[in-house]
Amino acid sequence: MNWQLISFFGDSTVLLPSAAALFIVLMLRKTSRLLAWQWSLLFGITGAIVCASKLAFMGWGLGIRELDYTGFSGHSALSALSAAFWPIFLWLLSARFSVGLRKAAVITGYVLAAVVGYSRLVIHAHSVSEVIAGLLLGAAGSALFLVLQKRTPDPESVHISWGGVACLVMVPLILLHSGSKAPTQSLLGQIATAVGPLDKPFTRTDLHKQAW
């Protein structure tokens, strides 16, 4: 199995443009604008927490050596962004169909996020604690969004036009085909050294070298 490809489903190259496309499509309809803002806020908070945890580690060395923890896994979190994105993405795409199909779409989204998280373990990009923390963070954000939608007085507000559906499907497919990974880790490392007290980004190796 191509675990690198599966991991790419949680890469910022795919998730951030796809998230932007989803926000734009929702904003085009007046009835779904509140939905767009609710989702973008929760997705943004999830991403901000992931970035903050990584900056805290790379800039100040704040990690947990016993758990091999260096911050939330962005792939399993942005998949806290896959677990925050894919369940909602698939739920919105299936909004016109039966309740059973919508539930299946959400479950598929969470399963995909979990598989992305597992792929990060297979390719040795994250520890178990980081993947679990990321999945829990992302799942919490998407679950809160879905709970909020149960209270919406207008179920039509979640319906996306067929043109919008086509656009939303094409964006991630094109990005997945590109295979280009976002340099988010190196960018966060540069920011961490700029704002933190360290001369270079703190690493997992540094964490395990610490004497207690």
Predicted regions and their residues:
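Long hydrophobic alpha-helical segments typical of transmembrane helices together
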Residues: 175-212
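Internal alpha-helical transmembrane segments of multi-pass membrane proteins
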Residues: 96-106, 131, 155-166
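Transmembrane helix exit motif
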Residues: 92, 147, 151, 177-181
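Hydrophobic alpha-helical segments of integral membrane proteins
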Residues: 2-9, 152, 187-198
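Interfacial helix-loop-helix junctions of multi-pass membrane proteins
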Residues: 54-71, 114-141, 183-196
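Internal/C-terminal transmembrane anchor helices
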Residues: 159-179
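Cytosolic-side transmembrane helix boundary signature
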Residues: 136-163
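Hydrophobic alpha-helical bundle signature of multipass membrane enzymes
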Residues: 1-71, 77-99, 103-107, 111, ...
